[in-house]
Amino acid sequence: MIPIPSSVRVWIATGYTDMRRGMQGLALTVQEQLKRDPHAGDLYIFRGRRGDLAKILWHDGIGLSLYAKRLDRGKFIWPSASDGAVSISAAQMAYMLEGIDWRNPQTTWRPKSAG
């Protein structure tokens, strides 16, 4: 995982996002739907309808970055609100990206082999 400074605020975009969107499309979503500045240095996490793919949009002061993570098994735990954004800590984000319920951390299934 890319080291994220502790000053960065992490936002989960609640609801579902069209995962065909790229960097510019997600930045537009942040600006129009979440009413926030995508270039302000905050980190935004989006999830698709199936729940196993998350995309992270972050402007680090130099440029805009887009990261993606797909879980081999299970789904990302997502807030139940259908509109807006929910703020979480960097530690909670790390749990989420490992497939662990960030609201109540417990380990989950891990693959034993690649094939």
Task: Identify the function of each model-found stretch.
Residues 1-115:
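Polybasic/polar functional segments that serve as interface/processing modules
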